[in-house]
């Protein structure tokens, strides 16, 4: 029977052979790797960055964002592109739906002159383009909008009534098998936007499912469920949507956290509104009655006026965001405890009301 010393020598020889054949870093101890702190790209929503646990969407991984129509899926991905471009990243948008509006993208902060766009004719072409971009190693963020629009070539060339059972699911499964390793090696973030369908005949449980089969569910490191929960009004006018995002899968931090924020028409995610709410929750912004104060200075009466002050005072707004990000992203447990405490307070308030 081999002694411990002989086992260690055999292991060292095997590791040496593997590294010689496949390159240095092809095998290592989990604790030795310097890539435990995953690089991330901000989503443009501070609350969502905190809920994700790593400060944003992870580089070198596949992410799925799904939800009903007009829930904010494309807006969220355009916000990710805007944040990536600010960080000096190169981005590409594969527009399988042929519906990307450059004017709207520019309003959300996207530098449309620097954004690579492709409008493929079929699903195979879209995924081949995605594969080529990933393999180039020169693109940092790729958005595919959407999985439902990745129509297989056979379906496009066939007659309208032809049955193509499972064709799209097989296409996605094959593509993701090829892409996953390349995405990790290129340290590229690939975001798939997906739509929701209803499963027929489901009596119990959730009848909703996403298109393109189950492969994307397995290969995704992060899955975000985005929903519209209400309207944002200015008097009688509707100026945006109340939006809720739930992290339904997360391989890099605790899943199942959710966050609420506003998406304003023609503006995108309301940064000032989030800063106020998170600032009050974590005691960086003081609220006394209807008045909000920051660093001992009154900034406005009512939420709307305070948001206006933050939008006008960019330096103060950036300072508050930096303080919140340093406190919450570095200590996600603290953010979680604050959410639990607020939930308990809300429950007590409801009990008192009853």
Swiss-Prot record:
Keywords: ATP-binding, Cytoplasm, DNA damage, DNA recombination, DNA repair, DNA-binding, Nucleotide-binding, SOS response
Protein's name according to its UniProt entry: Protein RecA
Compartment list: Cytoplasm
The species this protein was found in: Haemophilus influenzae (strain ATCC 51907 / DSM 11121 / KW20 / Rd)
Similarity comment text for this entry: Belongs to the RecA family.
Biological processes per GO annotation: DNA recombination; DNA repair; SOS response
Function description: Can catalyze the hydrolysis of ATP in the presence of single-stranded DNA, the ATP-dependent uptake of single-stranded DNA by duplex DNA, and the ATP-dependent hybridization of homologous single-stranded DNAs. It interacts with LexA causing its activation and leading to its autocatalytic cleavage. Plays a central role in DNA metabolism, participating in general homologous recombination, recombinational (postreplication) DNA repair, and prophage induction.
Lineage top rank: taxon: Bacteria
One GO molecular-function entry: damaged DNA binding
KW Chaperone (keyword) present: no
A GO cellular component entry from the record: cytoplasm
One Pfam family matching this protein: RecA
Annotated residues for binding of ATP: 67-74
SMART domains: AAA (SM00382)
Gene transcribed to yield this protein: recA
